[in-house]
Amino acid sequence: METLYENYLALPIDKGLLCLEQENPSGPYFCYPANAQPIGFEGAIMYCFLPEYGEMVFACNPESCADTYVYPLAKNFQDFIRLILACGTANPVEQIVWMDQNRFDEHRAAERKLLTAEQKAAAQRLQHEFGLLPMENPFEYVKAVQRNFDGSNIQYRDEYFDVTGLERHL
């Protein structure tokens, strides 16, 4: 049985329209975990799975406005797609980590106004193909996933510790 993620990869849509480019022309950044399995990229931001956290979806942002560079967005890929359906693209979902509810609502509304017909069509295709509904309260959902998240199992590369000055805990 194919997974939802495998079915997503097989869909003939431009994933870049969802802010999930399939290639990162910039190469790996210091904060990308060593074992990250990329889902897609939005500039320097990588959306990925980390095997030590199962089906959970993460964002890795070297220019993060939060106090961390790697943070969870969804419990699983299905919920991640539902978040994208609620927000139009992955961008507003990734921004939740440093926003309050009002700022998120303003950002999501502004981003929705900028969506192209092609972006809307890509999201509609996802919804049609998978029969999923948009996440009802994306802000609350993501904040709940991030609350009390234990990132101690993230497998950072040596470069992460060199750049941040943090000590590796073995």
What is each of the regions a protein language model found here?
Residues 59-100:
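Compact, glycine/acidic-enriched structural inserts
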Residues 102-106:
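Core mature regions of organelle-targeted
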